[in-house]
Amino acid sequence: MPKMKSVKSAVKRFKVGKNKIKRGSAFRSHILTKKPAKRMRDLRTAKYVHSTNVKAVEKMLGI
């Protein structure tokens, strides 16, 4: 049986670390002038995929 293909959009959005899956923050693409600098700084940092979504993301990535 051939290998499962990974979802290419998921491959571009998620990075797999040692034990967790990292993701970027939303709300950073446009209309940034009204958002405070503190919020923009916080949105810059990477987040981890929530435990309820890990199984679905792993399936998309073919893990």
From Swiss-Prot:
One Gene Ontology MF term: structural constituent of ribosome
Keyword hit for GTP-binding: no
UniProt GO BP: translation
Entry GO CC: cytosolic large ribosomal subunit
Keyword hit for Protein biosynthesis: no
InterPro entries (UniProt xref): Ribosomal_bL35, Ribosomal_bL35-like, Ribosomal_bL35_CS, Ribosomal_bL35_sf
Pfam family, one: Ribosomal_L35p
Superkingdom as given in the UniProt entry: Bacteria
Gene3D superfamilies on file: 4.10.410.60
SUPFAM superfamilies: L35p-like
PROSITE patterns associated with the record: RIBOSOMAL_L35
Record keywords, A-Z: Ribonucleoprotein, Ribosomal protein
Family: Belongs to the bacterial ribosomal protein bL35 family.
Protein name (record): Large ribosomal subunit protein bL35
Species for this entry: Campylobacter jejuni subsp. jejuni serotype O:23/36 (strain 81-176)
